[in-house]
Design a protein with these regions (language model features):
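Alpha-helical transmembrane segments and immediately membrane-proximal extracytoplasmic
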Residues: 1-441, 445, 450-451, 455-467, ...
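Structural signal for short hydrophobic segments within the conserved structured cores
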Residues: 451-455, 508, 513-516
Length: 578
């Protein structure tokens, strides 16, 4: 204990822990990649060629139908034994960072690792990067617990895990760091920046030792034909935002369809496997992570019909998979969809615009950035991911413009990003800041006071006044003859009633029971209720089988103090030392 305390309470010690985190998460991410590749090779066969510009012949024949069906059945069996019957991903890491001081269940990471290997290895058209981030985050949460880390250090270590996972998965250390700060940690601060960079460097060491220092995609030397094309690139960002919105609504539609069919949650991946397998008979390149298809599109090796077909197949297949609860991420699908969309957009634009445009590959790169930016809600890290994946900075203006337009239009639409939508489905809204998010999840029960007395509705105001004075209480809870809660009375309301008629019963001056707030109410909802009621207090009730039971009183001042404390804690995390 003394050793761990010494390590984590010195800057050098925490830097060493950050480096270890990078090595650990980098190793877990590479292990996930290798396991998925091994399973794909076992079930589909090894690739016939290493040339990214040639079609991968292993995705052919009846295996593309049967293997996804087999995978869906296995995932269904596994899902039946998972607590909550739900696999976890990046939204859970965001939630842990914003609302749970970085605490995560390491068992969810283990189940995610097994399930992701099985789903992607059997062809689910999803990504590995999101699960890799979640697996790494759950491991570092376990580390933080073992080292007795405080809230701020635990959150920083969570950011280290995210940076290391993205770095090891994509070979993009700069983008990994920015993604961790932009999406997971939620703010930029020098105190957090240094450990996250160190973790990313640790992941780079692991990645380079296994795969070498090579970009994920190798491209020709693309150039923008003319700056007058910028409005065309901006429009591509607008189209990308609509495609992502459509993808989200397809996921919603699929979930609603499963619910309407009353299909058990655990059996849905099996049926999804059948649909994905049938789709793969026509578009096998849409299976799995899809880097082969993405590379072909970026290198201008796919015709219009195949680009459009793969675009629809990945969108529909990804929506079906996610809607059924199949584990996997949206990083790689976003890149795939973007590359295909950019290619299709180029064909349409060249048919409509008489002037000569840049090559199709340029539009595939720009489309990849636009879709990923809209999907992830992380435009800065998306730009860097695209640049580091392609090692092509000549397209920077077009990529930045399309990504900015896509992100801007997403903010004007119902769902600002895929991750934010997933959190909103659980009643978590982080758009207004982490302090507002904490207020939404923190209930009022710990702020309830016992500063009240109970009186019968037939008691006179004079008697209530005497009882309040003798017990030094400011609120009277009014009960009927059956001891059921029917209203409340504050000292201000008591004084107003006494001035009118001292011998009137308290029932005549009380607030009705509708002014009460259930004990499960969040702090934010409680504050909104107090504002709507225009009151400084409210009785807190616990609803039983027969009647509401008053368990205490909550004051506006206590809610406002809680809000202030949370805002100060959030700012301290961003700018403070500890």
């Amino acid at each position: 204990m003394r050793f761990t305390h010494r390590i984590t309470n010195s800057r050098l010690g925490f830097f060493l822990l950050s480096a270890f985190t990078g090595l650990l998460v980098g190793s877990s991410t590479v292990a996930l990649i290798e396991c998925v590749d091994f399973l794909q090779g076992l079930l589909f066969g090894e690739p016939a060629t290493d040339d990214p510009n040639q079609l991968d012949s292993r995705f052919s024949g009846w295996s593309v139908l049967l293997v996804p069906i087999f995978g869906g059945i296995v995932i269904s069996v596994l899902l039946r034994f998972i607590p909550g019957q739900r696999f976890h991903g990046i939204p859970d890491v965001m939630e842990a960072s914003a609302l749970r001081a970085g605490k995560m269940d390491v068992r969810s990471g283990v189940s995610a690792a097994i399930a992701t290997t099985l789903s992607l290895g059997t062809g689910a058209p999803l990504g590995r990067e999101g699960p890799a981030v979640h697996i790494g985050a759950s491991l570092t949460s376990w580390l933080a617990e073992k080292f007795n880390l405080g809230r701020t250090q635990s959150l920083t270590l969570l950011g280290c895990a995210a940076a290391a996972a993205v770095t090891a998965s994509f070979n993009t250390p700069i983008a990994g760091v920015i993604f961790a700060l932009e999406v997971v940690v939620g703010y930029y601060a020098l105190r957090v920046f240094a450990p996250v960079v160190i973790a990313a460097m640790g992941a780079v060491i692991i990645r380079h030792s296994i795969y070498g220092n090579r970009p994920e995609f190798t491209l020709p030397d693309y150039q923008i034909g003319s700056l007058w094309e910028l409005p065309v690139f901006a429009l591509l960002g607008f189209v990308a935002a609509f495609v992502v919105q459509g993808f989200i609504y397809l996921v919603i539609f699929c979930r609603a369809g499963w619910d309407k069919a009353s299909a058990p949650v655990w059996i849905r991946p099996a049926f999804a496997g059948v649909l994905i397998g049938a789709m793969a008979l026509y578009y096998p390149l849409a299976l799995g992570v899809g880097y082969e298809g993405t590379s072909l599109a970026l290198n201008e090796n796919l015709p219009l019909v195949l680009l459009a077909g793969l675009l629809l197949a990945k969108v529909l297949g990804g929506a079906v998979a996610i809607g059924s609860g199949t584990p996997g991420g949206v990083f790689s699908p976003a890149l795939f969809i973007g590359a295909m969309l950019g290619g299709v957009y180029w064909y349409v634009a060249t048919a409509l615009i008489p002037a000569e445009l840049s090559s199709q590959g340029v539009y595939s790169v720009v489309g990849m950035a636009a879709i990923a930016s809209a999907m992830l809600g992380a435009p800065i890290s998306t730009l860097l991911i695209v640049f580091e994946l392609t090692i092509d900075y000549d397209l920077v203006i077009a990529v930045m413009l399309a990504a900015a337009m896509a992100s801007t239009f997403m903010q004007l639409m119902p769902h600002s990003s895929f991750f934010r939508w997933q959190l909103a489905e659980r009643g978590i809204n982080l758009n207004s800041g982490r302090d507002q998010g904490l207020l939404r999840t923190k209930t009022i029960d710990e702020f309830v006071t016992q500063n009240f007395i109970r009186v019968n509705s037939a008691v006179t105001l004079t008697a209530v006044e005497t009882s309040m004075y003798s017990h030094r209480r400011y609120i009277a809870v009014v009960l009927n003859d059956n001891e059921e809660f029917i209203g409340s009375l504050s000292t201000d309301e008591l004084v107003a009633g006494v001035v009118t008629d001292r011998e009137a019963t308290c029932k005549s001056a009380m607030n009705a029971s509708e002014h009460a707030i259930p004990d499960s109410t969040s702090l934010l909802a409680a504050l909104q209720s107090l504002n709507e009621l225009d009151t400084n207090y409210a009785p807190v009730t616990k609803t039983g089988d027969d009647a509401e039971e008053v368990v205490g009183v909550i004051y506006r001042s206590d809610v406002l103090k809680a809000l202030y404390d949370m805002m100060r804690a959030a700012r301290s995390e961003e700018y403070g030392v500890n």
